[in-house]
Design a protein with these regions (language model features):
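Generic beta-strand structural signal
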Residues: 105, 125, 131-133, 143, ...
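Low-complexity, intrinsically disordered or signal/transmembrane-proximal segments
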Residues: 7-10
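Short, conserved beta-strand element in jelly-roll/cupin
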Residues: 100-115, 134, 164-168
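Conserved, well-structured core segments that form or line functional sites
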Residues: 159, 166-196
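Ligand-binding loop in jelly-roll beta-barrel domains
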Residues: 137-170
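A short beta-strand-loop-beta hairpin characteristic of the jelly-roll/cupin
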Residues: 107-129, 138, 142-144
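N-terminal, Lys/Arg-enriched amphipathic/low-complexity engagement segments
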Residues: 12-109
Length: 196
């Protein structure tokens, strides 16, 4: 993602993947690196949108909402990061209440904190701690992504990436699907650095 200033070089990289032993891949070197920050990042096709949310929410209350003043937060459209966190489109619990998507896929990686997902296919559940959700909107899906504040004694950190991938024209009206990849089942890769 991001604009490339140089052509990538090729090298053979050995990846150690657990629980497998190892594989060898020939792949391009990193094309560009973007500073990790709050909000959208530059993208190139087929990436439509990539965003990083890093919020340090206050302790939660019994409704999983912030047990703190909402003064300075633009309720319903809060992206200002006042006090180190945003409510986004949430009115009580932070997050994104029910909204539609069509013609693309979303990949959501919840590194820390939790996401409560519900959708028009009847799926629902909570994920976090390294879990990955892959949703194909295709012909259309409505879903909600809310960030419950479960800890009532200390701050609730949310560290989340979401990437939107454009579907090719022939797949834009594909049936919508939803898949979870739980952290403990995702192989981990540790690359050896190519000689430079």
């Amino acid at each position: 993602m991001g604009g490339a200033s140089n052509q990538p070089t090729q090298c053979e990289t050995k990846f150690w993947i657990t629980p497998l032993t190892h594989i060898r891949l020939t792949m391009p070197a990193v094309v560009s690196v973007e500073r990790l920050g709050q909000g959208p990042m530059p993208t190139d096709s087929p990436f439509l949108f990539a965003v990083h949310h890093l919020d340090t929410y206050p302790a939660g209350d019994a409704k999983m909402a912030p047990a703190a003043s909402l003064r300075g937060h633009n309720m319903g459209a809060d992206f200002g990061h006042a006090d180190g966190w945003s409510m986004y489109h949430g009115e009580e619990v932070p997050g994104f209440p029910k909204h539609p998507h069509r013609g693309f896929e979303t990949v959501t990686i919840a590194r820390r904190g939790y996401v409560d997902h519900t959708d028009s296919l009847g799926n629902g559940g909570r994920f976090g701690g390294g879990d990955v959700q892959w949703m194909t909107a295709g012909a259309g899906i409505s879903h909600a992504e809310m960030f419950p504040l479960l800890d009532q004694a200390k701050p609730n950190v949310l560290d989340l990436f979401q990437i939107w991938l454009n579907l090719p024209k022939k797949n834009k009206m594909a049936p919508p699907t939803f898949k979870m990849m739980w952290a403990e089942t995702i192989p981990r890769a540790s690359p050896q650095v190519c000689p430079g």
